[in-house]
Amino acid sequence: MDSTLLEIVACPICHGRLALDQTSQKLVCHFDKVAYDINQGIPVLLAEQAMPLSARQEEP
């Protein structure tokens, strides 16, 4: 994912900063404890498609 895009995207739920999980290739909101898919380089930032993080994924 483009680093410039990563700097401007925000969580659609809390509007907070998202982090890129290099392992799963998902954008993670540690505040809401959810992850968002990245489809062909485009983040899918729909609150209804957010996936809850497992306990292991919650660590920054």
From Swiss-Prot:
Origin superkingdom: Bacteria
Pfam family, one: Trm112p
This protein's GO CC annotations: cytosol
Transmembrane segments: none
Cited PANTHER family: PROTEIN PREY, MITOCHONDRIAL, ZGC:162634
Entry similarity comment: Belongs to the UPF0434 family.
Protein name (database record): UPF0434 protein PM0859
Protein's organism: Pasteurella multocida (strain Pm70)
